[in-house]
Amino acid sequence: MARPIYVRFDVPPELASKSLEALELARDTGRIKKGTNEATKAVERGVAKLVIIGEDVEPPEIVAHLPPLCEEKNTPYVYVKKQSDVGAAAGLSVKSAAAAIIEPGKGKELLEEIIQKLQALK
């Protein structure tokens, strides 16, 4: 499958899995926003600490606005292979194209590590 138009860089699998782990920790001990609309609002308000975007979103226009918005607002973002993984990590029984971590809770150190590695990727 060709790379979607909104994917701007390749994320190593271990970094993607750490991002999902941070999302799960934030879900249990902090605060998250589930779905593209809520993630977009969190970025626009400047409260998102990390945005997780699925690479298999169809049609891609659903999340195509998120990477440029995150860059404009200096919000780190990461891609994971499947949106079903995003939904599961967010505690949903359905897939989710995107999610945002608002308060990392017990995953604060993990989140800081992810952000450092993302800055090195770009």
From Swiss-Prot:
GO cellular component terms, A-Z: cytoplasm; ribonucleoprotein complex; ribosome
Family annotation (SUPFAM superfamilies): L30e-like (SSF55315)
Gene Ontology molecular function terms on file: ribonuclease P activity; rRNA binding; structural constituent of ribosome
Complex formation: Part of the 50S ribosomal subunit. Probably part of the RNase P complex.
Keyword tRNA processing: yes
Principal subcellular localization: cytoplasm
Listed Gene3D superfamilies: 3.30.1330.30
Protein role: Multifunctional RNA-binding protein that recognizes the K-turn motif in ribosomal RNA, the RNA component of RNase P, box H/ACA, box C/D and box C'/D' sRNAs.
BP terms from Gene Ontology: translation; tRNA 5'-leader removal
Protein name, as recorded: Large ribosomal subunit protein eL8
Domain of life according to the entry: Archaea
Protein localization: Cytoplasm
Record-stated family: Belongs to the eukaryotic ribosomal protein eL8 family.
InterPro entries assigned to the protein according to its UniProt record, in alphabetical order: eL8/uL1-like, Ribosomal_eL30-like_sf, Ribosomal_eL8/eL30/eS12/Gad45, Ribosomal_eL8/Nhp2, Ribosomal_eL8_arc
Keywords (A to Z) from UniProt: Cytoplasm, Ribonucleoprotein, Ribosomal protein, RNA-binding, rRNA-binding, tRNA processing
